[in-house]
Regions:
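Interface amphipathic segments
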Residues: 1-215
Length: 215
């Protein structure tokens, strides 16, 4: 077995503190206590760049049965959470390794001000090179859409409600689903800023259809 006693990495108010014992037994565990740890730094360590997440993570990550059939999970609060460079407030996430399907399951809620909220439920499978994150938007900041629509729009300042999925091969991720949005955006090819109210958007692989819009 492997024993870890208060292994600490610290910088200013940030820290990672690791304690516990790793063995084939499910009764033994390694616990990492995190405070204000840069999420982007963690993703760089594991070489995951298919989807951009950022923010400062605080919480605990636990690994059991490290030398047998590993079981890993984490409960984290992430301040200043960014999804594809779009701010979504504070993310409260439960992440666990699904041994049966060999994927990372994610259940999370991102809270912004004024009751705006984003609910995330899905998985990432490095083994199958696949992602499927269901997103329920309730007044969600749509800045993250620029990463999917950057070829024809930018400067998105809008909020939306509806359901979409970030889905597909990790080398070619798509957005599918339906939302209703109010705000403004800049159409790059026309060099024109559009304002819209209750714009209905239907996302399909590699395309977004706009319906019943008032501009």
């Amino acid at each position: 077995h492997l024993s870890v006693d208060n292994f600490t990495v610290k910088h200013d108010n940030q820290h990672i503190i690791v304690n516990g014992k790793a063995s084939p037994s499910p009764e033994d565990s390694i616990v990492a206590d995190l405070k204000d740890v840069d999420v982007a730094y963690i993703l760089n360590l594991v070489n995951f760049h298919s989807v951009d997440f950022a923010g400062k993570a605080t919480g605990k990550a636990i690994v059991k049965s490290l030398f047998n059939q590993p079981d890993a999970y984490a409960k984290l609060d992430i301040n200043d959470f960014l999804f594809e460079n779009g701010p979504l407030g504070v993310l409260h996430a439960f992440v666990n390794y699904n041994k049966v399907d060999e994927q990372i399951d994610i259940k999370a809620v991102a809270d912004e001000d004024k009751g705006n909220q984003t609910i995330i439920d899905g998985y990432v499978s490095p083994k199958r090179n696949y992602i499927d994150l269901g997103i329920t938007a309730v007044g969600t900041n749509m800045k993250f859409m620029e990463s999917f629509c950057g070829s024809f729009m930018d400067n998105i300042e809008a909020r939306a409600s509806g359901k979409v999925n970030v889905v597909g091969d990790l080398s070619h991720i798509n957005l599918v689903g339906d939302i209703e949005a109010t705000g403004k955006m800049h159409m790059t090819q026309l060099n024109t800023e559009y304002h819209f109210e209750k714009l209905k958007a239907h996302a399909i692989p590699d395309d977004i259809l706009l319906r019943n819009d008032t501009i």
